[in-house]
Amino acid sequence: MNITQIRNATIVVKYANKKFLIDPMLAEKGTYATFPETIRQDLFNPLVSLPTSIDNILDGVDAVIVTHLHLDHFDDVAKNVLPKNIKMFVQNEADAKEVKASGFKNVEVLHQDTVFEGIQLVKTKGEHGRGEELLNLMGDVCGLVFKHPSEKVLYVAGDTVWYDAIEDEIHTHQPEIIVVNGGDNQRLDLGSLIMGKEDIYEVHKAAPHAKIISVHMEAVNHWTLSREELKNFSKEKGFSSNILVPEDGESYTF
C-alpha cells in the first residue's frame, strides 16, 4: 500500500491496486472563513496550499471516502471537481442524501461488511470530541479499516478523540498501519475535537507494533498541536520509531 498526505485530513490511499481519495478538501489557501469559537480568528482556511494539482490528486481515483461532511473533509471545490459518477462512500443515510443532493450518482453507505473490488471496508466508530454538548454540535463521524489478503491491515481513524471504542477497534482488527487525525484542533469553549499527543500515545500503547501516521495538522485555523511538538513528544515517550508525521505531499509505502 501507499499512503500520501495531501493536506489536513485529505489523503490518497493506494491499496490492493485501487486508489482511494479520503476526505477531500481541495480549495485554494484562504478560501473559507475561520471556524467559530477557535483560535487564529484572523486567518482564513485552509491555511496552506495544496502540495500538488487537483488533476494529480484525482488522476486514477477509483473511489472517494467521506468520513463526515464537515467543510475541512468535503468542501465545495471537491463537490465541483469530482466526477458525478465516481464511487462515493459515506458514513450513513443522512450523509448519503446530502452527497446525492450535490449531484453524485454512485453513493454507498459504509457498513461493517462493505466490499469494494475485493477490498473489505469496515466502518469504525468515532467521537468528534468529549462531552454531550460538543458531540451534539459536531455530529456523527466514522473511520474505517481496509483489509485485503495482499496487504497489511490499515485503520483510518477519522475525526475522533481517544476513547474506549477506539481501543476496541484496534483490538478487533489488529491494524499494522494506523492513520490518526492528530492536530488537537479545539474549540475554545468546549475543548479538543480530535486527537492530541496524549491520545496518540494511547493509540501507540494499544497497538505497540503498528506504524502510526498523524495527519490533520497545521492546515485549518483551530489546530493546537504542531508537527514539531508531536515529534518531540514521541521522542520523550519513546515511540518516535513508531510514528510518522508527514509534510503535505509526503508518501509512504508499506
Swiss-Prot record:
- What's this protein's name? UPF0173 protein YddR
Q: Which family does it belong to?
A: Belongs to the UPF0173 family.
Q: Any keyword Chloroplast?
A: no
As recorded in UniProt, its EC number(s) are 3.-.-.-
A single GO molecular function, which one? hydrolase activity
Instruction: Kindly name one Pfam family recorded for this protein.
Output: Lactamase_B_2
Keyword list (alphabetical) reads: Hydrolase
KW Hydrolase (keyword) present: yes
